[in-house]
Amino acid sequence: MTNDVIKLTDLNKEDIPADLRAETYFDFKAHPFEHQELFEQTNSVYGAILAIHEYAAKWLVDIIGQKRSSARVFKNKTPPRFAAQAGAGAAHTIGNFEVLLQDGAIFEPAWVIGSLKDNLRHSIYVAEGAKIIGANIYLENGSMYIGSQTTIEPGVGIKGPIIIGKGTEVRQGAYLRGDCIIGDGCTIRGEIKNSCLMNKANFPHPSYLGDSLCGYMTHFGNQATTANLGIFAGLVEPAKRKALIIKCNGKAYDLGKPKMGVCMGDYSQLGCNCVTDPGTFLKPYTISYALARISKGFYGPNEILKNKPLEHGIIERSPYKPEFSQKTEDRI
C-alpha cells in the first residue's frame, strides 16, 4: 500500500472508488427516496454525511415556504384547542418560534423552545394526520418537518434542523439531536445526530447513531451502537483531532473530518449489542451477529459477520444468500 494519503474532498465524483460511492450501498431505482438529491450533489457517501446540515436547512426553508399558504400559523405560541379538550394546561414555551399545522394534525408538546434572538425564528411544520404529544421541541438551531401520519410520542426530545417523513413512529425515549433526515415508515427510539435514515429503516431500541447513513430497511438490534469517534481521539481537544483515514483498494483516503459512524447499505442489519468502529461500511445484505465488534473497513455485500469465540480481533465472514431467506419467508 502506498504511503500517500489522498484527500477525499479533493476528488471529482468520477475518481471516487466504488466502495465510497452511493450506488454501491443504495438502490434508489428499486427504493426511491425523497432526499436522493443529497447523494447526487456530493462526491461520496462520506460527502453526503458532511452535507446533511446544509441540505436539510435549505430543504426546510423551501418546503415550509411552499406549505405556508395551506397551513394554520401560530407565532410564539401553540394552538390552544387540543390542550383545552384534554383539560390540560398549554405547553411551556420560550423564545421565538413558529408552528404551522395542517388540518388533522395534533400538536400537544410538553415544551417548545425557540430562539432567544429577536431577529431569528425557526418553524415546525406538522402535516395532516401527524401527532406530536408530550414531546420536547427545540427550535433554537433549525426548523422541523413532520410528515403525514407520523407519531412522536411523549418523552421524545427533538432538535432542528430535522426532516421526518410519512408514517414514521418516534417512540418514547428517542433523542434526535438535529441534522437528521428520516424517511417514510421508519421506527425510531435511540439517540441520533447528523445522520440520514432511508425509508423503512428500523432504529427501534436504545442505541446510538451518529454521522451515519442507513439504507432501505436497515435494522438495529437492541443496544447496537455505532462509534463515531475513536476512543483515543476522544482524549484529544476537538480542534486538534486528526481526520479519519480509510484504507480502500490499497490506498489511504483522508475523510477530512475525525468523525464517522457507519454506512449501512440496503437491508443490512446490526445484531443486538453489536458495536461498529468509526468508519465501518456495510454493503447491502450484510448482517452482523449479536455481540460482535466490527472493525472499520468494508464488508459485504451478501455477508454474515461474527466474532470468533475466544480469539482476539477475529471476524468470521460467511456468504449470505438473500434469495434463500426470502424463499424461506414465503413458505412460513
Set out the residue ranges of the language-model regions.
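Terminal amphipathic alpha-helical/low-complexity segments used for targeting or macromolecular assembly
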Residues: 1-129, 285, 291, 300-332
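Short, charge-rich amphipathic segments
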Residues: 43, 142-156, 240-241, 245, ...
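Ordered hydrophobic segments in well-structured contexts
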Residues: 125, 146, 154, 263, ...
